[in-house]
Curated annotation (Swiss-Prot):
Transmembrane segments: 193-213
Gene, per the UniProt record: SEC22
UniProt superkingdom: Eukaryota
Species: Kluyveromyces lactis (strain ATCC 8585 / CBS 2359 / DSM 70799 / NBRC 1267 / NRRL Y-1140 / WM37) (Yeast)
Any one GO BP annotation for this protein: endoplasmic reticulum to Golgi vesicle-mediated transport
The v-SNARE coiled-coil homology domain, residue ranges: 132-192
The protein, known as: Protein transport protein SEC22
Disulfide bridge positions per record: none
GO molecular function annotations of the record: SNAP receptor activity
Vesicular compartment segments: 214
Membrane topology: Single-pass type IV membrane protein
Length: 214
């Protein structure tokens, strides 16, 4: 399950974070570790990685000077976590891309983006979406090759997030294919949720037209 989402500028400025009702002390500890990780980024740090941290995994992607981070339970599918991050990145860039590099941006200035975070998290935590992962995982293995590090090594043993190797062109293409497939699953889920309502509404309008307006 996705537990928390955080968005930072690479210089450490927090731009947005999900408003989590969960007061679990262990989750709060993960958020503290995320802030430390952000301070360790260098120009050579990997653009995508997973950091194992106790019962959680911290997944992140970096793009256009912004770092998108999700804290998920250890058993949550990694491919789904990175697809979630890709959706978050795309919408955040579309909504605020022109404002992110300004020097007068305040901490958590884009907190209103939490509305999108909550809606998207609800979709990605839906068991029906996760159930469709099996077939995708059989065809698309590339995202699983994301670099994995341990939080203790990063914080206390001098390890870094530097790239182990660049993703190959084919791997990047597989990642794009995966995200497109996952987005289709999300769309199909929304259709299944709202199609009955739309059908009932259409029937009601048609009935009114038939009785009074024709």
């Amino acid at each position: 399950m996705i537990r928390s989402t955080l968005i930072f500028r690479e210089d450490g400025l927090p731009l947005c974070a999900s408003v989590d009702d969960d007061t679990d002390p262990s989750l709060q500890e993960q958020k503290k570790k995320v802030k430390i990780l952000i301070s360790r980024f260098t120009p050579t740090s990997a653009n995508e990685a997973t950091v194992e941290s106790g019962d959680f995994e911290i997944h992140y992607i970096r793009l256009n000077t912004v770092v998108y981070i999700v804290v998920a339970e250890r058993n949550y599918p990694r491919n789904l976590a990175f697809s979630y991050l890709a959706d978050i990145q795309q919408e955040f860039e579309h909504s605020y891309g022109g404002q992110l590099s300004k020097s007068n941006v305040r901490p958590y200035e884009f907190v209103s983006f939490d509305n999108f975070l909550q809606k998207t998290k609800k979709v990605y935590n839906d068991k029906r979406v996760q159930g469709n992962m099996d077939q995708l995982n059989q065809d698309l293995k590339g995202v699983k090759q994301i670099m994995t590090k341990n939080i203790e090594d990063l914080l206390y043993r001098g390890d870094s997030l530097d790239k182990m190797s660049d993703m190959s062109a084919s791997l990047r293409q597989d990642a794009k294919k995966y995200r497109a497939s996952a987005q289709k699953i999300n769309f199909d889920l929304l259709i299944s949720q709202y199609a009955p309502i739309a059908i009932i509404a259409f029937f009601f309008v048609f009935l009114l037209w038939w009785m009074f307006l024709r």
